[in-house]
Amino acid sequence: MIRIGCTTFSEHGSLVQRKTSKLFEYASVFPVVELDTSYHYLPKEKDVRNWLTQVPDNFRFILKVHQSVTTQGDLPEGMSMAEALTAFKQAIQPMVDAGRLYCLLAQFPNRFKCTKESVAYLDEVRQWFAAYPVAIELRDNSWYQPEFRSSMQAYMRKQKFSLVIVDEPKKLSTTVPLEPLVTNPAFAVCRFHGRNDVGWTATGPDAKKNRTLYRYNEKELSELRQAVEETAAHAQEVAVIFNNNAGGDAADNARALIEAMQIDYQQLNHSQLELF
């Protein structure tokens, strides 16, 4: 099955004709969502249970692991890594029990390069989340160089990591290629960030906002469709996440891809209009 959705559920005003959208409303259009709240702070079990009440049985969540896991931030105050991992796992257990967790996502920064030390760290990540499906996103193209590419893929397969299939700006020397490399046949993840060459490497207070300021055109969506179809030929489940939402374009692009692929999702939430 191919599930197409977006990052977050609350920032897609085009779905509801107002600034923010609710999870219940989002789940009337898309069957999967990526949540990054767990990247910034540890989720609370009560919030996880609340999310589950707002989505149908066939809806799936992708949860970003905490920033401390991917070397991009500090541990929660007063916690060791072991304590933080335990708290995280306890909080998401209701989602696991309900069968709604698609996978955990570990997105590493571009300074996380292909070195022996990085591979050793990924070994630790696998140990920390041994019982969970884990997708790994690599942002530096050193992992994709000819001398490392095959061994990198073999390593991902051995660890049962799903290497995230990424679309990002094409004109920068450090970005990774869009290649449908499936390293875990059970599930795959595609993340589409847009192709804003200038914004991708911008710095300053508006850097995050500009990084994903992009709207895919029809030709580019056709390229993404081909990548998704090639991925689906080698994976039982595929989750496609549009992250190009700085300008509110993710939901529109996601819906356009659903239409282009002629996917008709069943058992979504009823839309608000259908309730009256």
PLM segments and residue spans:
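Residues lining hydrophobic/aromatic ligand-binding pockets adjacent to catalytic sites
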Residues: 1-276
